[in-house]
């Protein structure tokens, strides 16, 4: 899923686990011809080390780790180990289909395993190895970016962080500085400098060489479109077919991206409220003019007093907004948002909003967090320059209050905290720039008209920059491929299997 760096309440979770990098592997690598780079030598085996007992449900799956140097300038130095899963094609193999679910920070190993279920019996499973690799710092790859303990993350979530007075802003920025320092102390600056999309694109080509394929097929969702675009830019001749769904426009800077994303979330909040209003007892009522006000009447009191839940933690303000954002990614979650808001209205049980927040933040029922939010922060902070002028962030706050009033607490004060990336210990390794035109037929872009996290216009822009066809899905959700729409799915399957490039299409 594409995550939002929400203004006003930093949605960046933290977990602490001191992790070291591994020593370089002693095994020799296969010989390479003149001018070629050797592929690392790996051994494929059981996926239980990544998937646990779930590996038994995919008996043909094979897993391995692929070593890559932490520093490009020190290829024989410390290595990261990339977790890789491969579910072999069931019939005549065309090649490998790399999948990336987005984030950044979501596990592609988990995504590929799940996609193997969804595509079972389809031409995609018949002709392609389904492959997922976790970029460095992410998921099952090691070292995994982890910055705070579970208890520290729980405590962070209890802080509403809505005081935008000068003193309140200074306190929030101190929290952001502390988080950045913890990440640097636990992971090291050298490792953090190499976790961005630029490195991930090069690592994906290393995995391609391990698989022995001349070209890749690629399906990227949300942030996965950014990774795919970066790979296409670096290795255009190594792409057979690529689909980018839920596009991120690489030409957008941080400010433009925030403003566009907040606009998208307000549009979908309105879609949710309109759908909710069709049912008797909708907690937001039936008058569109009052939906935002009613939402604030329900959630703003949580700043000073948590809402009731069966979980002893209760529902804090930050969790209520996080849960709301999570629900807006898909209409399938709207019923949980309604249930949580009804719990606040009736002062009974708002636990469904807490459940949505836990899922978004990667907290399991036992109170342990995945490293998804830490990886999300580590990647985004090096992928693009972050404004450091406080006046820029005050202006962003003013504009997002106008564009997305549902998520804005209180009144504009003229002050706002700088994002934690403004305090990141290493500089960015990439900068916004338009995507380069792609080789004809090598890429297709898919964009959804009411996508909150990756708004439709970003897909239009990316398709234009790549000189690629655009498939438009007329709907309200985040991403669309292999999500039950026959119009889209048949076009995508024909493209991957037969290289039948669709024209511009609306489904």
Annotated model-derived regions:
Residues 248-266, 338-341, 349-365:
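Flexible "cap/lid" loop of the alpha/beta hydrolase fold
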Residues 351-384, 388-389, 393-396:
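Long, low-complexity segments enriched in small/aliphatic residues
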Residues 1-29, 204:
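Secretory targeting and sorting signals
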Residues 32-319, 378, 384-507:
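Gly/Pro-rich cap/lid or specificity-loop segments adjacent to the active site
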Residues 305-321, 329-333, 366-374:
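Structural motif
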Residues 279, 344-353, 485:
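Short, solvent-exposed helix-helix connector turns and helix-capping sites enriched
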Residues 328-346, 386-391:
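Short helix-capping/linker segments at secondary-structure and domain boundaries
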């Amino acid at each position: 899923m594409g995550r939002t760096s929400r203004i006003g309440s930093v949605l960046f979770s933290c977990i602490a686990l001191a992790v070291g990098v591994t020593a370089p592997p002693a095994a020799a690598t296969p010989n390479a011809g003149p001018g070629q780079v050797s592929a690392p030598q790996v051994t494929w085996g059981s996926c239980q080390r990544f998937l646990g007992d779930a590996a038994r449900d995919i008996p043909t799956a094979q897993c391995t780790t692929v070593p890559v140097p932490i520093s490009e300038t020190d290829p024989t130095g410390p290595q990261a180990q990339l977790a890789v899963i491969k579910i072999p094609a069931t019939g005549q193999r065309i090649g490998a289909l790399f999948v990336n679910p987005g984030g950044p920070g979501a596990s592609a190993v988990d995504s590929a395993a799940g996609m193997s279920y969804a595509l079972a019996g389809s031409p995609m499973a018949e002709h392609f190895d389904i492959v997922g690799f976790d970029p460095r710092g992410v998921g099952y790859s090691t070292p995994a970016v982890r910055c705070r303990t579970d208890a520290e993350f729980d405590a962070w979530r209890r802080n509403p962080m809505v005081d935008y007075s000068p003193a309140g802003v200074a306190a929030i920025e101190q929290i952001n500085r502390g988080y950045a320092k913890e990440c640097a102390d636990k992971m090291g600056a050298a490792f953090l400098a190499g976790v961005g999309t630029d490195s991930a694109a090069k690592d994906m080509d290393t995995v391609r060489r391990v698989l022995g394929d001349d070209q890749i097929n690629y399906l990227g969702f949300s942030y996965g479109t950014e990774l795919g675009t970066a790979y296409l830019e670096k290795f255009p001749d190594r792409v057979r077919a690529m689909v980018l769904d839920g596009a991120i426009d690489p030409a957008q800077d941080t400010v433009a991206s925030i403003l566009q994303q907040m606009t998208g979330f307000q549009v979908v909040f309105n879609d949710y409220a309109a759908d909710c209003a069709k049912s008797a007892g909708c907690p937001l009522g039936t008058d569109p003019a009052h939906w935002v006000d009613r939402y604030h009447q329900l959630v703003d009191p949580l700043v000073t007093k948590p809402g009731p839940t069966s979980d002893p933690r209760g529902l804090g303000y930050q969790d209520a907004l996080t849960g709301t954002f999570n629900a807006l990614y898909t209409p399938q979650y709207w019923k949980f948002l309604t249930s949580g808001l009804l719990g606040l209205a009736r002062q009974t049980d708002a636990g469904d909003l807490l459940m949505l927040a836990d899922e978004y933040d990667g907290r399991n029922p036992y109170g342990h967090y995945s490293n998804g939010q830490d990886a999300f922060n580590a990647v985004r902070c090096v992928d693009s320059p972050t404004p450091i002028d406080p006046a820029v962030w005050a202006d962003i706050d003013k504009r997002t209050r106008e564009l997305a009033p549902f998520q804005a607490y209180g009144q504009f004060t003229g002050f706002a905290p700088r994002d934690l990336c403004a305090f990141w210990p290493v500089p960015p390794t990439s900068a916004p720039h338009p995507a380069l035109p792609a080789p004809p037929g090598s890429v297709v872009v898919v964009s959804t008209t009411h996508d909150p996290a990756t708004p439709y216009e970003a897909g239009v822009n990316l398709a234009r920059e790549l000189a690629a066809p655009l498939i438009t899905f007329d709907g309200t959700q985040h991403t669309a491929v292999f999500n039950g729409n026959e119009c889209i799915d048949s076009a995508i399957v024909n493209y991957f299997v037969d290289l039948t490039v669709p024209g511009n299409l609306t489904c």
